[in-house]
């Protein structure tokens, strides 16, 4: 099992550790690759990572395929889920050469819709601030590596993800601006291109992914199974009294993936 983490996540994220516990229980090998800059070590290139980073996903899966001859089951969480779906869309029928099945959990399938949701109300006051507090210092470290890489003042003035993506994420990764990035990196428009067993998990009360944009079965095609529970939040799916027990998600997703081998 290989898990691709979410925005500013890591192998220490609660969901990564919950899936690790499930993999140990099932006696399966398990790996969490870190997107660039998320391991605690600054990457060396003039770039970071983004929601449509399918080339990075492909490079990692190719290396895993070279080293592991058995089935590979891929899981993507939030940003990692969207990027994993974009990889499967780009690969089409070739994706099954690398993985047997994949699951996406709480992926922001429509980045513009999620960007608007994160930029409003409580989300803006809490989550936007949290993300920027993590990403801005990394951007400064990147600028120290590559002077002139982006507009320092504009980055420091960014008050939401739209602003940050416009000055940092988009130009560093080949996009014209935030709109171009969000449009081209969103997995939603091309889901019917996927040609291997895929599970899309999205809670209908996810504060980052509006229920109105979630696809129905007709839109996604025959290779994709949808699980859209009323509750679950954003990568929550806890059971029991708060703060809840987190094994529900890996048990459900893991069982589905193992059945596809």
Where are these regions (language model features)?
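Catalytic nucleophile-loop/oxyanion-hole region of alpha/beta-hydrolase
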Residues: 36-73
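Conserved alpha/beta-hydrolase
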Residues: 9-12, 20-44
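Alpha/beta-hydrolase-fold enzymes
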Residues: 68-172
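Short beta-strand element of the alpha/beta-hydrolase
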Residues: 1-6
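Conserved loop-alpha-helix segment in the C-terminal half of the alpha/beta-hydrolase fold
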Residues: 204-225, 229
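Active-site nucleophile elbow and catalytic-triad environment of alpha/beta-hydrolase enzymes
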Residues: 167-190
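Catalytic histidine-centered segment of alpha/beta-hydrolase-like enzymes
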Residues: 232-247
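Short beta-strand/loop motif that positions the catalytic acidic residue
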Residues: 194, 200-202, 206
């Amino acid at each position: 099992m290989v898990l691709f983490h979410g925005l500013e996540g890591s192998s220490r994220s609660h969901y990564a550790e919950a899936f690790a516990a499930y993999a140990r229980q099932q006696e399966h090998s398990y790996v969490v690759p870190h997107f660039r800059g998320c391991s605690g070590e600054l990457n060396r290139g003039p770039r970071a990572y983004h929601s449509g980073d399918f080339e990075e996903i492909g490079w990692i899966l190719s290396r895993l395929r070279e080293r592991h001859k058995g089935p590979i089951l891929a899981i993507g969480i939030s940003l990692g889920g969207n990027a994993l779906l974009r990889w499967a869309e780009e690969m089409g029928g070739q994706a099954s050469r690398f993985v047997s099945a994949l699951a996406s959990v709480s992926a922001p399938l429509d980045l513009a819709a999620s960007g608007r949701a994160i930029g409003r109300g409580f989300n803006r006051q809490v989550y936007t601030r949290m993300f920027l507090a993590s990403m801005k210092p990394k951007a400064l470290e990147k600028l120290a590596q590559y002077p002139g890489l982006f507009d320092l003042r504009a980055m420091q003035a960014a008050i939401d993800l739209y602003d940050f993506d416009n000055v940092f994420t988009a130009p560093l990764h080949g996009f014209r601006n935030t709109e171009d990035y969000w449009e081209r990196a969103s997995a939603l428009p091309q889901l019917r291109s996927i040609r291997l067993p895929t599970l899309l998990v999205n809670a209908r009360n996810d504060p980052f992914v509006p229920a109105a944009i979630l696809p129905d079965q007709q839109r996604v095609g025959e290779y994709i199974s949808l699980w859209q529970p009323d509750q679950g939040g954003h990568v929550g799916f806890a059971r029991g009294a708060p703060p809840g027990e987190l094994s529900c998600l890996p048990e459900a997703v893991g069982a589905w993936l193992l059945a596809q081998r």
